[in-house]
């Protein structure tokens, strides 16, 4: 009984440590796509997903809408 309790506590601490290691320090990177033409929401999202497995959205820039892609940085 005592061995199984100690083992269970050890496994919980181990799993929590692994989860913390995975999420700690993960930064998000950004890149602008479709600079030469006006942004289309569906095209922007598709390009970002294909290129970086990220999320893309259009935002108003000075003269036109630009595509901003946000994705997890590679370490």
UniProtKB/Swiss-Prot annotation:
Residues 1-25 form the signal peptide. Disulfide bonds join 29-73, 39-58, 44-67, 48-69. It is found in: Secreted. Keywords: Antimicrobial, Disulfide bond, Fungicide, Plant defense, Secreted, Signal. The keyword Disulfide bond applies. The keyword Ribonucleoprotein does not apply. It comes from the Eukaryota. This is Putative defensin-like protein 119. The lineage of its organism: Eukaryota, Viridiplantae, Streptophyta, Embryophyta, Tracheophyta. The gene is LCR53.
């Amino acid at each position: 009984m005592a061995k199984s309790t100690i083992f269970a506590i050890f496994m919980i601490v181990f799993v929590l440590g692994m989860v913390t290691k995975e999420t700690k320090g993960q930064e998000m990177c950004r890149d602008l796509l479709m600079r030469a033409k006006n942004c289309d929401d569906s095209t922007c999202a598709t390009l970002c997903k294909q290129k970086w497995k990220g999320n893309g959205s259009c935002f108003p820039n000075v003269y036109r809408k630009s595509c901003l892609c946000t994705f997890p940085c590679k370490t």
